[in-house]
């Protein structure tokens, strides 16, 4: 996946969210494929959390669907589910929720370990001109 400014913003905000929840330790990546964008471990409980970012354009891609399915089905050695956080723009949250139901990742009885984190996308900032530059 490309590292567009939107995706970088989503990733930073999702990492901040995981840190607030106590998943502050960066886990060493293993040689499993595919590799999640974010892997964190709670230093207190030792629980693993995965994180992925999803853009509007990703919602229709088969590769995104496969990644979401793969990471939502991952288990620890002791067969407990791994928490999975998906960072998405606020405007795209309903579409992602519908996709998760369509892929049978979340429903009324399953998918409690999959958490959608809506993130406000920042507006593009304009560079201010100083009074000196305006005078020419």
Question: Residue spans of the language-model regions?
Answer:
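Well-ordered, non-membrane alpha-helical segments in soluble/globular domains
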Residues: 9-12, 61-71, 99-101
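Arginine/glycine-rich "motif VI" loop of SF2 helicases in the C-terminal RecA-like domain
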Residues: 72-81, 105-108
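Hydrophobic beta-strand residues in large extracellular and virion-surface proteins
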Residues: 14, 25, 38-39, 86, ...
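Domain-level recognition of nuclease-like catalytic cores that cleave nucleotide substrates
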Residues: 90-136
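Short beta-strand-loop-alpha-helix junction that forms the active-site gateway
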Residues: 47-65, 90
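Active-site beta-strand-loop-beta-strand hairpin of nuclease catalytic cores
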Residues: 36-50, 76-79
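Acidic-basic catalytic patches of nuclease active cores, encompassing PD-(D/E)XK
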Residues: 1-34
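Acidic beta-strand-to-loop metal/phosphate-binding motif
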Residues: 81-89
